[in-house]
């Protein structure tokens, strides 16, 4: 049974923004992920626990965006006008802590670790899109930094169910506890 200490646990939501949602191909839809993440966020807020909303973003000229040559570039050719915005169902509030990242992981080049440590956080509940990219990069970094991790499996999605399931079944069990949103809500 999962037990979480409300005083030392934070929710970190990865890339739930309008420009990323279309890339949720499975096994959970973007709407399912956002609604479940919204339930988690509401519970954390009601308990006075911190909610971190992490977004990826660059300047208009993409000066600081990654540009290395790769075999499988991002499928995004043009970003929609509202690509930065959090979906309404996430219920973002002024009490949420915004983190802007420019890499896949939420720790590199941001003050996320500082924000967590100064609040006495030792456990992170992690969710978002994509399971195997932004969420996994953040999870790996968090584990390397000594944080306890809980992955909200049904509040994550990837480009395909296969990509999602690879992270859920093979990577996360080595660095985290993988649970449903319902199990996490019951543990808070």
Curated annotation (Swiss-Prot):
GO MF: hydrolase activity
Q: Does the keyword Transmembrane helix apply?
A: no
The cross-references to Pfam families, in alphabetical order and at most eight, read: Isochorismatase
Q: CDD domains this protein is in?
A: cysteine_hydrolases (cd00431)
> Top enzyme class of this protein?
hydrolase
Keyword annotations for this protein, in alphabetical order, are: Hydrolase
Source domain of life is Bacteria
Q: What is the protein's name according to its record?
A: Isochorismatase family protein YecD
Chain's gene name: yecD
